[in-house]
Each structure stands twice: as C-alpha cells, then as structure tokens.
Amino acid sequence: MTLRLDTSLKRGASRNIPPIPTFSSVSNENLSSSPYTSSSYYSSNCESLDSIGDISIDSSVYSSSEIEFVGNGDKKKNFINNNNNNNGNKYDFSNLLETPKLKFSPSTGRTKNNNNNNNNNINNNNYKKNDNQKKNFKYIEDNESDYLDDENDEENVDIDLSILNVNFKIINENNSQNNNNNKYQINNNMQKTGGRNGSVFFVNNNNNSNNNNNNNNNNNNNNNNNNNNNNNNNNNNDNSNNKNNFKNNNTSYTHNSNKNNNENKNTFAIKQQLVSTPKNKLSQTYREKVILEHLNILIESNKACNFPKLINWYKAAPTSNLSNVNNNNSNNNNNNSNNNITNSRYGSNYEDIYDDNYYDEVDDYDSGKEEEESTKTITKTITTTTASIKPNIQYMHLILEYANMGTLKEYGKDNNFEFTISQMKSLLFQVIYSLAISQKEFEFVHNDLHFGNVLLTSFPVDKKYIVYQDKLDNGEFNNWIVGGDFIVKISDFGLSRIKLPSNEIIYNQRNDRSKEFCFYSDLYSFSSLLNKIKIKESPSSSSTTSTSTSQVLIKSDSDSSSSASSSSSSSSSSSSSSSSSLPKSKNKSNRSKDNQSKLDPEKRLLTKLKKSMKDLPPYKLLDHPFFDSLKVCPNDCLPLNSIRISTNGIVPKEFPKPLSPIFEKNNIISIPSSPISTTTTTFPTTPTIKSTTKKISKTIVIPSSPSLALPPNLSVKSPFAPPSKKQLQQYQQQQKQQTISMFKYDDEEEKEEEEKEKEKEKEKEKEKEEEGEEGNIPKEKLILKMTPKPYIFIHHFSPNSLGPLSPPSSTSSTLLGALSQEKFEKKQRQIQDSEKVNKNEEENQTKDDADNISPPLPHAIKKSIYNNKNNHQKISTNTIIKTPIKAPIKTITQIPTETPNKIPNKTISQSNPVIIRDETPQKGIPFEKKVVSTPLIYKERPHFVFLKKAKLSSNSNNKENIINFHNNNNNNNNNNNNNNNNNNNNNNNNNNNKDSYNEKGNATSYCNGDDDDDDFKIDHKENVVSGFLIEKDHEFIGDKENSKEKQKVSKRVQDKAWQELNAFLRKNPTQGVSRIKSTDYPALSDLFPKKKRCSENNFVFEKEKKQEKENKEKENKEKEKKQLEKQKQLEREKLEKDRLEKDRLEKEQQEKDCLEREKFLENERLEKEQEREKLEKEIKILVVSKKNRTNPLQKDYDRYIKKVGSSLTEKRASKPMNDNI
C-alpha cells in the first residue's frame, strides 16, 4: 500500500536525484593510526579517515545537491552504489556483512590495522573480569523494561569502551609530536551518552592539519603499553574538571547557539553500537545505517532538512589479545567513565520502552543459525580468568551531524516545558513535514517518536528561515516560512521501517507489526506527549499567528502610544514577530483580556490539531489553519538568509514576496513591498469580505508621489498615501466583523447557529401565516380551510371587488375569491369581454328598463352613497363570493334569457345577484344546482354595512332576471312600492322552500336580521367597503325551522352578539379572514342553537363530538394503564421486600444453626475428653492392682475399651495381658 499525496505534496521527479558522493574502498595496506587517540577510524573497507581530506560542511548543505569529500585523487565517491538506484535491483548488503579488518583494544582504546600482529609475549594473566565491574555506559531505564531490540544486546560483553574516555590531556602529552597528523580528536569537554548496546561520543575535525600518511606503528604500540596505567590513574583527577567544563559548555551552546555555530561545523557525533548478529542483514545497526542513507537522499535533493546527516560509517572489532591491565586501574577507569554519561542522544533506542502489546521479534538469518549460536557461546564463555575475545564481536560506528542544542526533552526541562506559540508552530510543522515527505518517498515509519528522539540544532550564522515550497498543478506555490530558535532533527532509526526503491522493506523482525505501513502511528504517539508542553502567555507575543497574507491589521485608538515603536522593533527581530507586537495598554486588566482574546484562538486551533494528528495523515495536516500564519513572509526573509526546501527537489526561482507595514497614526495596513507603479491603485482587500473592499477601492485614489512618513527601520518605500478618516472608520468596522468571524469561540459559534435557526423558524412562521396555516390568507391567494372546531369565518372584501377584479392593494384587505396573480388577469379579461357585451345590450333597452337596471357599480356607489348621504340604498354586488364548497361557481352579472330554462319554476328577485354552480359533474364533487343570492346594504358611508338573508322568489311573471337597486326611501315612487310588494309575496312563498346545501357541511348562510337597519351595524375604516358573512363548518341547516328558533332568541342576545363582532372588526379591520371561537364570544353561540342535533335546521357537530369522545376514551385508557403500571410496580416492590426479608431470616437461621452445631461438637469433644481421663485413671488403678496381684475392675476395663475404639483393642491383641490380670 503506497500513500499518494494528492493535495499538498505533489509527486515530481522524486527519484531523479544526483548521486550522493561518499568514501570509496581502499586497500588496507600501509594504513596508520594514532596510538592513543581514537581519532583515526576507517570505513567498512578499512579506509582511513585521514585519507578523506577536508569535509566541506556548510550552511549551504541544505540547498546544494552534492557534498564533496576531497581525498586521494580528489575523487567523488558514492554513498550508495549505483546498483542501488531505482533499477529494480536489491540493496547490496555485502559491505555491511563483511568482517572488519580494523581492530582496537577495548581496554586502552588503541586501534590496530594488522591482524598478523602476534602479541603472544604479553602476559594476560593479570587481567581478570570483575563481576561487579561496571561498563563504560549506564542504562538510562531499568533493566526490567522490555526492549524490542536485536538479540544479544543484553549480553554482558567483557569489553571496556575506554576508547570513549581517553583523557584529552594525555592525548596532548603523548601525542604532542603527532597532533598535526590527527584528523579527528575526541572532544572530552562534551559529555558522552550511552545506552544498552553502545555509546555516542563527539569528535572534532582539525581542518588545519596536514595529511601525513606515514606513522610509526611500533612506537605507538609501545606507548600504548607504557602509558595505559597513566591514562587510567589520571582519569580520577581530571574527571571533575570535565564536569565543570561540560556545564559551562552546555550552557554556552544551548543559549548562544549562533555564536558557536562555526565550531559546530567541525564537530561530529560518532554512534558506536554492538552488532549483535553480524551476518543478519536486518540487524538493528544495519537497519539504521540503511535508513540513514536513504534519508540522506531527501537532504541532498533539497526535499528535507529535518534528519541528521550521515557523514560516514565503519565497522571495527576488538583485538584477539588484550594488554595487561590491573584490576584497580580498570575499576577506576570504569568509575570515571560512568560519571561522564548522561541521557542518550543520537541513540535513544538504548532507552526505548515499548508497550507490552508489541509482538516479539523473530530473527531470520541468511547464513543459518550456526554463527548466531557461536556469538552466544562466545559471550557466555568469557570468564574472569580469560581476556581473549573472538573476532565475531563487531562494532558499528556511524559518524553523524552534531546537534548543539540537545534533545527536545533536555530543552523542555531547561525551560520547564513552556513554549511560545511560534515555537510550537515551528516544532510541529517541521516534524509533520519531515514525516510527510519521508512517507511519500519511502513509506517511512519511525515507530519510536518521542521527545528523546527529537534533536534541536541552531540555525547557521548566515541563515534565519526555512522556506518550504510545494508546487501545485496550476503552477502556483504553497509557501511556509519557518523561523525561530532551532531546526528539528528526527533521530534514532533502530526500530524504524522503510521501503526501498527496489520494493524491499526494511523493518524490525522481532515485531511483525512494524512491517505494515501505518501513517498515523508516529503522530499518534507524539501528540499524546504534547500535553506536557505549556503555552506561554506573554504580552510581547507576536500577532502574526492570526494574520493572513492579505489581512490588514488595525489597532485600537487606545494603543496609539506604542504602535509605531512595537511594530518597528518586531519587524526586524524574527518571522514570528515580523508584524506588530501586542500593544501595551495602561490598564493591566485590559491588557490581559486583549492577550487572551488573541492567544485563546491559537490554543483552540492547537487542541484541534492535536486531535486531528491521531486520525489524519501528515500531508493533510500541513493545510491546518494553525499553520496559516507561516504562510506570511516576513520583511527580512530573503533567498540569501533562508534554507530552501521543495517537495519535488527542484528549488524554484519564485520566492514568496514579503510584506512591509505602513503606519498611519494608530493603524497598520500591510501591503506588498513592491507594488505596481500606477497612478490609481485599489485599497488592499481581504480574502473573506470582497464586497466591502470593492466599495472602498472605488472611493480611494492614491497619488503617485508618496506623502507618508516611513519608520526608520524600513528601507522599502511605498507609493501609497494614507486613506481618509472616514474610509478608515468604515474599514475598521469591516475588519472588526472579520476578526470576530475569524476568532470565534466554539460557544459563540453555537450561539450564532442557534440565533440563525431561530431566525429561520421565525421566517417560516411568517410564511406559514401568509400561506394560511395560522388562519391568515396571503395577498395573492384566498384559501378557506375547513376546521373541525365550530369557528365563524368573517370574509372581508374591498370596494375593488365590487367592480372588475384587480390585484390586492396594501391598504385594503385580501379579496374574496382571489386565487393568484395569474388568475386575476384571466378574470379581468373575461369581465371586460362580458362588460362590452352588456353595454351593447343596455343601449338597445328602453328607458323603462333602463330605470330598473343599475349602472356600473363604481358609478352606483358614487351616486347612491356620496350624492345621497341621507338616503338608505340597497346595492347588490356583481362579483364572485367564494365559498368553501368544492364545486366551481359561475357568476352572472346580468342573466340572459336562456338562464330561466335551466332553472325551471324559480325566478330570482330583482334586488339579488345570482351565483350558479356549474352543471357539469366533476370527479369527487357532487352534482348540484343551487341558487344563492346575497344582498348588501350601504348606509350613508361605505364603512357602514348591513346584512340581509338571501331569498328566492317564485314569480313566474319576471321573464328576465334583472338586478335593481332596492330602495327603502319614501322618496321612491310606484316602482319601488311594487318591488316591496313583490318581495313580501316572495317571502311568504319562500317559507316553504328549503335552501339545500352540501351534505358535507361546505355551505354558507347569511344571518337573518330584522327590517330595522340598526341591528346589524358594523363600523370599519373609512374608504373601505367591506361586507362579511358568517359560515360554519360541518353540516349546515336550511330555513324551514331556522326562523322559528331565531324568533325565540331575544333582541338583547342579538345585540350582544353583533356588538362583539363590531368590536372585533374594529380591532382587525384589514384582516382577510379571522376565526372567532364560540367560547370567546358566547353571545354568538346563542345565534346557532344546538338542541336538535339530527334535524335539518340545527347546527350539528357530530365529528367534533366523536373526536372529543375518542380523546376522552384515550385519556381514560392511558390513565388506566398508568394505574395498572403503578399497581404492578407496587406489587413488585412488595415482592422484593418479602424476598429480602426471607433471605435475611434464612441467613439468621443458618447462623444460629451453625452456632448450635459448634456448641454440640464442643460438648461431644468435652465428653470424649472426660471419658478418656476416666479411662486413664482406671488404667492407672489396674496397673496398681496388677502390682498387688488383684484385678477388681476387669469387667469395667473391658467395657471401656469397647467404647474407646479399635486402637486400644489392637494394642491389646498385639500385647495381651497376663493371666493374672
């Protein structure tokens, strides 16, 4: 399974990298070394380090593609063979598996290059192994901890690693003549580190030394034998000085790392490890060497800089014969060496502790198990009397880059594990990026990432930043600029896993789980350790953590005193403080609040990052918002003072543009340092708010000549002029909103979401109210919904409804019968066509007929109401009165002569308009033929409205149905009187006629009123002609018995009812449809009697009553269920109590029985003891009687013997008594 990075890290020419030069193989002939120092080491093929020449290690090593090792012939050597390129060939382990020819004395540290040197004359009898002898290193952790390391690492090997403890003074004294020949010298001022199977010591490279290839080996050997005792004796005296030197040196390179950087170039760390299984190519030491080689590929190809560089490596073995060493001297030497050992660095696998869940490792060797067994037997057969060591024991030496600031663990202890936000960002980003690029290239997994395995080094003298660049598909770059105090180096790869270009996997065989590629394991373990680190909350912390590339920083007015000074000083300090620092306010409380408001969001982002580190792969974490501030390029970041890293290995020409702050009073506006030279430019915009910045940019015109005073530290001039105060005030408001949206707490976000949801709910409720769900009707539609409760619907319609249909106005209420805006236009066209036809017919009519015919309604209203204010006139409507009946309705303004044929034996009164249903049947709608008339009466002004019952006339004389004004005035002449007489006759005839309605109750009725007009007076606003009708749900009754029942109702009740309606309509004059409950207006309920439920002339509400009954039954059932449940619970509780009581009684009874039984047994035991005592007494008596030759108790003796048991009988049988007894 390979990890493909699709978002942030793009696969480029990752394998097309230049070859990495290294040391070549040279024969072992004529090699020389210094006798006392460990300065001359050799490679795996026995090449001397003296022949390497000068090693050019510079700060530019991160940006260069090659390192040149100038040696014999000035040839460039390859670190990895050409066979190991991506050609499908496997890795060549032949150099690793070879037995080394280089030998050294473990007791004195002398190196020898000749296996033929026979030192048989040396007496080795004086050297004895002391069981209590300490090694030259100590275990950092307890011995009981389980280590997943290679086998034989824990074996006690009788090797004194005094090569690490040679005193620097003795080296100078004994090698004063040959100091120039030493290429490397041990730096004894620096503490050595050690672990389970090896140690780490530090050497210095003498660049000014001359290469002398000829050394006197004989003199060296003699000096080694003669000065061994001096070496061991002087260690006691000089160790105390070394401790003090280390303390001073340690503080100097941690705190003054930049000053000592030149010295660090010539300092290297040599990691010496015991090769437990020399013929196993997957041994721990070999694995680490292979992994370091391939990680160097990333370093040399400019893809990473967060791994320690492997300078060289070599193998060595101790000599077969050891020199003479006294026991006391060896003990002193070992004791002195232990004082110089501290926590492990570069090799924390010596102290690695793993969980018990890991599996044990199983070693599979290429050459069999014979060599493995031989190494085991050799290490175990070393006795106190023998000092000979077989050549199978080997040591691997890795020359690594030196980290002058120690481990992250040491750095954290010195600082009490308190880091600033900028330090945390640089630390986490470097760790995450190094894992991301190594996973991309080699599927690398560390498997042991903790604070002890993270090294810290200072920046080189001429470097200040690390610029990481990732090229996207569109040609642009993602840039991250990391600065600060240190560079992170991940070390110790003894337990790591890597996939080679030849698809061969290098992993720990004792842990099968490590063979699988797990991208989250390293960060998962590392994130759990981050909880130890605390974030400093200092007022001088930089504000770049919350800025973006195009963000504008604006300070408050209260911080004017410190804005210029703080920002100018911070811009030249570092990348984390490139922007303005936090202002110092006068009040400490305000300052603390401001700091918390800016730091808390970063802390929240940090906690989110820690959570996501446990789930997401490293390459996705690079785009986390916690690292957004790293995308801002500081002003002092240049290609010369930065280490450039690219994900594809090709350093681009493009470099991120820095930002230069411009100051204008209390405000800071960040703009590019090299803007386009134009006369008019736009105001800097933010990525989030585009609309606001566009408005501002239109109003701003910046002159070409700058009129702005730059701070003294800034050398870049800007052609921008400061904006006006109004523009800045506008921009401040916008920026505050933006900052609030950027740094929102989780609680605030939840509150805003809740507020938004509430607003949405309110909008939905408003829409529902408009659509009619709450009882109101929208302006474009009139929807009458039938409800099961006995509501009274009051319909209002405006004066526009009396004439042609028109869309609703804002002042008037909703139109009765209006369906939608589209239907309005259709109805208007139909009415206009019908009006044209009517006009042609009216011109042909006679004058007599013209008197009886009403003019158009608007003209009629003006004529009858405004001109005749004192007269009462009855006007009928020409419009649709929409009812909740499902059947469609037709309106007839002037009924033609053909309509009476459709309605036989019935004519329509002259004063009533006609509403006729369609005769065409429809699906789901009953076929009905009904005629309903609705007269409306207007008194004095249009806001006085009266209702009368619609009646049908059976006058067959009226051949044509004509709509007339019905006048009750005395001024009217004979025509009006005749009409009144006709109406009286019609009333008598209509008593027998029934108004049939829909059986389902979808019908309307009009409340009867007396002839007195004052009974039904309802007041409305002026200029609003509105009428209302009262309708009921469910079954509705006709007229037969309705009149008789309503006669029983007194006028007082009617007056109360209509007064209540009048008050309601005054409160809600423009409401389209309002629902009035009978409970709210009890007087209205008396108008609709409920005595006769099944009769045709009463209001029957069977459905409601059924529902009420069902609801009551449900409630009763629920109550019964609850009661039953309560009873069951009580019964259960009683049963439980009874059971507990029974158990208690049984326990008590058992205890009593046990006591009684014990008493009974004790009584039996006492009785038996008493019987035995009696027997003993009797036996004594028998013995006495025997002496006296008498036996008076023979019978009793036999009887007691039977009771005692068979034991006495057996004795008696075996030894019978005398006859005398």
Curated annotation (Swiss-Prot):
Keywords for the protein's UniProt record, in alphabetical order: ATP-binding, Kinase, Nucleotide-binding, Serine/threonine-protein kinase, Transferase
One Gene Ontology biological process: mitotic cell cycle
Its EC number(s): 2.7.11.1
Comp. bias intervals (Basic and acidic residues): 591-604, 757-769, 823-850
Pfam families given in the database record: PK_Tyr_Ser-Thr
Ranges of residues in domain Protein kinase: 186-627
Domain of life: Eukaryota
Protein name: Probable serine/threonine-protein kinase DDB_G0286465
Native species: Dictyostelium discoideum (Social amoeba)
